[in-house]
């Protein structure tokens, strides 16, 4: 009876010792799994973490690698996130371990006992040894977790930054694509042979202008105002004096030049104009220096730079030299600066203050602006009135053609005024001042100072208390301003189109009666207050009124050979309708 009692105490001690031994072995095995693999020191790029936390060569030729090795991307794709975000991963089977070269003994009774005790300690309730073998989880080492998280953060930053940079530079490229570029193509426009609008040679009526310039050689040298002289003094003191030689650098990527400054031409809206000559080639040109009596702003500088790129807005003719030849547009062929000079300088002359910009347009040479020319022929004596009327007819026909070129190129000038046209010595009429040029359909806030040459829709938008005050630039906008300029050519003033005016031929020409009927009717159609009903420039050249004016101009031009010699009698020219 005493044997069972005496035998029970030692057996309890044995079982307690065995339990402590099992717990110690478990702790030792878990601690071994936290050691840093020495293989990471060699090449982390060629390694991946297996589900058990072991290191497996990615480039192993083993046939079971796809089954046993889980890359970071594959794990994320199958689980919807990094496998490190899971509590654990499944262990490989003994047969798989043996195939990968890792020696793993078959599970013995003692090992099964250890696993059973381990799961019991963790609160596991799994019942079978096979289920425990497949479902066993192991804790991933801390350094492995940190490394994988750092890789994920680096990948997110890399892809996120590259995507954001792609969107940013894509937006920059899109803005740059919309901005006009100095694409100075050398080829002729594709429709050169079929488009009758293009200029190819002298046109009827140029001899009339040459005759007037011969009779009035000082027409381009009219007395300058006090403000013009003061502005020239400011430019001479701060930037470039008459007779001075300067080396200029191109803002458009063109070769540098050495220029000699000539006489002053006059003060134009963007700045001061004067003659210049290329010292190396002897090429004559007109230079325009940016000048303003108001404090210069960044917007003023940008406006000049945009005008230097305006030729890029044309649909077909994207070369300033070709635009000068085929369209008779005086677009700048270069935008230059004088190195070593400030971009903007404040200067004072004759008690007036102005700002001189170190930005210069280089343009083909001109002789006189149209507004000055019209003022001069308005002073002709009675006996020279037929010559003056023939010149007005020429200016009318050519102004319509020039604005039709704008429409044909898909652009809107936006600021057609009498001094937007100028004449060359050979009698050609040209259009200039493309600082406000935009593509048709753009929205622009029209300045209030051009009110009498602004169509009704532009005035209404500018005076509206609601909205941005912007006007949609259409071909009808330029057509209305064209009609106003033609009115000035014949009547020496802008038409009365203020509030309360009557839209009729009789009202407009009530104080200007000596105007041909075809001109009156054409102007009436061009300044129609209705945008939809207004006659456009391309339509105007097909009207009977315009055709009749062309015939009258051809007859008048036969009277002059261009050198001042009469080539016909008065009977060769039909009388202008009045």
Swiss-Prot record:
Keyword Secreted included in the entry's annotation: yes
GO biological process, one term: symbiont entry into host
Ranges for region Disordered: 56-82, 559-578
Main subcellular location of this protein, as a coarse class: secreted
Record-linked InterPro entries: Kinase-like_dom_Apicomplexa, Kinase-like_dom_sf, Prot_kinase_dom, Rhoptry_Rop2-like
Residues spanning the signal sequence: 1-33
Record's keyword terms, sorted: Membrane, Phosphoprotein, Secreted, Signal
Domain Protein kinase: 259-546
PROSITE patterns in the cross-refs: PROTEIN_KINASE_DOM
Coiled coil: none
Biased segments, Acidic residues type: 569-578
Cellular compartment(s): Secreted; Parasitophorous vacuole membrane
GO cellular component: membrane; rhoptry; symbiont-containing vacuole membrane
PTM comment text: Phosphorylated on multiple serine and threonine residues in parasitic extracts and infected cells but not in extracellular parasites.
Keyword GTP-binding: no
GO MF annotation, one: ATP binding
Gene3D superfamilies from the UniProt entry: Phosphorylase Kinase, domain 1, Transferase(Phosphotransferase) domain 1
Entry function: Thought to play a role in parasitophorous vacuole membrane function during the infection of host organisms.
Name of protein: Rhoptry protein 4
Source organism of this protein record: Toxoplasma gondii
Gene: ROP4
């Amino acid at each position: 009876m005493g044997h069972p009692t005496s035998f029970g105490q030692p057996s309890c001690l044995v079982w307690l010792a065995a339990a402590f031994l099992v717990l110690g072995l478990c702790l030792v095995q878990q601690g071994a799994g936290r050691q840093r693999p020495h293989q990471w020191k060699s090449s982390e790029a060629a390694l991946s973490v297996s589900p058990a936390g072991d290191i497996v060569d990615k480039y192993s030729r083993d046939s079971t690698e796809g089954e046993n090795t889980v890359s970071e991307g594959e794990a994320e794709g199958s689980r919807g996130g990094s496998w490190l975000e899971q509590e654990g991963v499944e262990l490989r089977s003994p047969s798989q371990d043996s195939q990968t070269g890792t020696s793993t003994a078959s599970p013995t009774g003692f090992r099964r006992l250890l696993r059973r005790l381990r799961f019991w300690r963790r609160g596991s309730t799994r019942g079978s040894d096979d289920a425990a073998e497949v479902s066993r989880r192991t804790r991933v080492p801390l350094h492995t977790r940190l490394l994988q998280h750092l890789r994920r953060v680096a990948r997110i930053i890399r892809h996120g930054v590259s995507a954001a940079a792609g969107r940013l530079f894509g937006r920059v490229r899109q803005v740059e694509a919309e901005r006009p570029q100095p694409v100075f193509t050398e080829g002729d426009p594709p429709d050169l042979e079929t488009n009758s609008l293009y200029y190819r040679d002298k046109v009827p009526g140029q001899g009339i202008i040459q005759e007037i310039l011969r009779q009035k050689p000082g027409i381009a040298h009219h007395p300058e105002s006090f403000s013009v002289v003061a502005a020239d003094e400011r430019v001479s003191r701060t930037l470039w004096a008459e007779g001075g030689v300067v080396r200029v650098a191109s803002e458009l990527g063109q070769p540098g030049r050495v220029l000699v400054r000539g006489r002053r031409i006059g003060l134009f809206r963007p700045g001061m104009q004067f003659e210049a000559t290329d010292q190396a080639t002897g090429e004559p040109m007109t230079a325009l220096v940016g000048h303003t009596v108001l404090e210069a702003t960044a917007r003023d500088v940008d406006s000049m730079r945009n005008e230097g790129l305006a030729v890029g807005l044309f649909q077909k003719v994207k070369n300033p030299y070709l635009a000068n030849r085929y369209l008779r547009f005086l677009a700048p062929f270069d935008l230059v600066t004088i190195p070593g000079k400030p971009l903007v300088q404040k200067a004072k002359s004759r008690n007036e203050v102005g700002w001189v910009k170190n930005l210069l347009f280089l343009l083909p040479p001109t002789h006189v602006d149209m507004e000055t020319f019209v003022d001069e022929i308005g002073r002709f004596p009675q006996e020279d009135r037929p010559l003056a009327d023939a010149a007005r007819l020429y200016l009318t026909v050519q102004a319509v053609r020039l604005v039709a070129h704008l429409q044909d190129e898909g652009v809107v000038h936006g600021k057609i005024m009498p001094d937007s046209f100028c004449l060359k010595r050979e009698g050609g009429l040209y259009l200039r001042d493309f600082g406000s040029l935009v593509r048709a359909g753009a929205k622009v806030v029209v300045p209030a100072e051009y009110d009498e040459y602004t169509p009704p829709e532009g005035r209404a938008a500018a005076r509206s208390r609601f909205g941005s005050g912007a006007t949609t630039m259409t071909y009808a906008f330029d057509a209305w301003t064209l009609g106003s300029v033609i009115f000035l050519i014949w009547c020496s003033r802008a038409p009365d189109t203020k509030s309360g005016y009557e839209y009729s031929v009789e009202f407009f020409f009530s104080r200007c009666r000596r105007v041909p009927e075809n001109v009156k009717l054409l102007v009436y159609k061009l300044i129609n207050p209705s945008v939809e009903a207004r006659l456009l420039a391309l339509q105007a050249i097909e009207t009977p009124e315009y055709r009749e004016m062309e015939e009258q101009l051809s007859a008048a031009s036969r009277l002059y050979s261009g050198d001042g010699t009469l080539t016909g009698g008065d009977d060769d020219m039909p009388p202008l309708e009045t």
